[in-house]
Amino acid sequence: LYLLSDGVYILMYHLIRYRRGVVRLNLVRSFPEKTQKEIREIESRFYRYFCDLFLETFKTLTISKKSMVKHCSFQPETQAIFDQLAVENQSFMVVMGHFGNWEWGGNTFSICCRHQLYVIYHPLSNKYFNGLVYRMRTRFGTRLIAMKDTLRDMLNNRSALTATAFIADQSPLPDRAYWMSFLNQDTPIFLGIEKIALKIRYPIVYITIRRVKRGYYTVFAERIELPLSLQRSGTITEIHTRRLESDIRSQPENWLWTHRRWKHQRPK
């Protein structure tokens, strides 16, 4: 698998130069304190990770449960958080970013936890690839919810023991977003996670999936307590966004830099 990934890296990084301009600009603006040499090193390591991630995701179609849990494991404290929520018969929301191998993290959760995992996603326009992604994500029991149906489906599932996962680092429409500084840039953040959590009073668990070595990841979890009342909108959003920012700074090569995350300008 990883010999193939090394070949794909040469193709993607050196020959096709896939989104090199977007990645370089994102890195330079996110880390103004780093030298050009340091930026290039992060960029190269990112493309190696990106190629590994691409092939690891397809490996989901054939990997066994035993091997899945071996390659993407829970920290003991992480398992304890999920087990305690199950004992309390408490559904909750998962917040995470495009960091590490989020697909494998979802697989391991579905294998190891009592909660039924639902993942919020955008259906792809290409029916073939949408079907392929659906098979990969649901192979170990995970279920998918289209983003437009999120609140409705969560309310319909309130009698069940569920965990609903949100990827929080996508790019919302600027006039409906919460704006804050993220990686040294003015950034729109989804407020929907915070609004839903407060509406249905579900706990939030922030998850990070750290790359330990090539092909191996460890899942860390932290429970974010909901305040009884908010003095201002955005408090919870800022908490989980700062957690992600800290994770990215600690392992900058393991975040998805190919996205045009900062394509929107703050409305005046």
Q: Predicted segment positions?
A:
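Hydrophobic alpha-helical segments typical of transmembrane helices
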Residues: V23-N26, G105, L132, G192, ...
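Non-catalytic C-terminal accessory region of glycerolipid acyltransferases
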Residues: K37, E41-S44, D83-V87, C112, ...
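Alpha-helix N-cap/helix-start and coil->helix boundary motif
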Residues: Y47, Q79, F99-W102, N126, ...
